[in-house]
């Protein structure tokens, strides 16, 4: 894990292992090992921040939230839910070396047209952007 950059998020205690010649990280929410990629590094830290610092219960943090958009399957990185499992925040994570630009925002807004979360968070672990969706869609 030394090859991944320090992020602008609180440190997370990650459980890592080399399996099948690849670096893997334990996903405590889903109970499985995941390939550790630069984007997954950011996602693990965001999840740690949401649960450990903000206090969001694990049951309200949905990873790789699947939905259909225009007839194709899509996945939002993280969706935080509230009462009745209604989406409160859609989180789009990128690797630390990926700029958070208009294309990333457009992607999140497209996703949110289906997810209908009240808030959108875009992050590459270094920079974080938060948006309030006026009517839950844009």
Stretches with model-predicted labels:
Residues 1-119, 126-138:
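A short, conserved, highly charged catalytic patch centered on acidic carboxylates
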